[in-house]
């Protein structure tokens, strides 16, 4: 059952707003902290703008920052004052291990629950394209044929022949 607006956690509100921004502007890789805060005020999901939104966008929800009372992994800091939604495969502060990544379906307000399905697809596609775009990961397996006829131990022995 969708949650009442008054019961919506600030962290869940921040996640919803960030998801709305990503869905509306898929060409943008990330957003300024101020954009997220402004969109939260504009959406007014839980009523008038709440003062905790800013600190959640800056600190509490940011996976790759040391936790400060909250261990959420909902956002990822891409640069100074820049955020995007966290996705599996992103690095995060070790103390945030096991932290909440998305709102629970039963905690989503009416009209926003489809964002969870959108997020699963977006996150999956983003992971695939990140792997394909990474030049180091693209090299995986490229040298396999170089050593296909020689074991690693034999190769090292051959290299060391004649040392001393």
Q: What residue spans do the PLM features occupy?
A:
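Flexible coil/turn residues that form the inter-helical turn or adjacent wing/linker of helix-turn-helix
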Residues: 29
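Short coil/turn segments at secondary-structure boundaries
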Residues: 32, 70-74, 152
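Phospho-regulated, low-complexity intrinsically disordered regions of nuclear gene-regulatory
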Residues: 2-21, 47, 51-138
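Short aromatic-glycine motifs in intrinsically disordered, low-complexity regions
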Residues: 23-26
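Short linear interaction segments
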Residues: 131-164
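DNA-recognition alpha helix
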Residues: 17-21, 32-46
């Amino acid at each position: 059952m969708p949650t009442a607006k008054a019961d919506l956690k600030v962290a869940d509100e921040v996640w919803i707003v960030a998801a709305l921004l990503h869905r509306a502007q898929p060409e943008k890789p990330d957003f300024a902290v101020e954009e997220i805060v402004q969109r939260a005020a504009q959406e007014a999901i839980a009523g008038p703008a709440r003062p905790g939104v800013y600190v959640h966008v800056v600190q509490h929800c940011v996976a790759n920052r040391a936790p400060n009372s909250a261990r959420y992994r909902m956002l990822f800091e891409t640069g100074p004052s820049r955020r995007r939604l966290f996705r599996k495969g992103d690095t995060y502060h070790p103390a945030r291990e096991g932290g909440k990544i998305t709102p629970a379906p039963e905690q989503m307000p009416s009209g926003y629950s489809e964002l969870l399905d959108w997020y699963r697809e977006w996150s999956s596609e983003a992971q695939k394209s990140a792997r394909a775009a990474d030049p180091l990961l693209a090299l995986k397996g490229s040298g396999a044929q170089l050593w296909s006829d020689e074991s690693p131990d034999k190769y090292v022995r051959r290299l060391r022949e004649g040392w001393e």
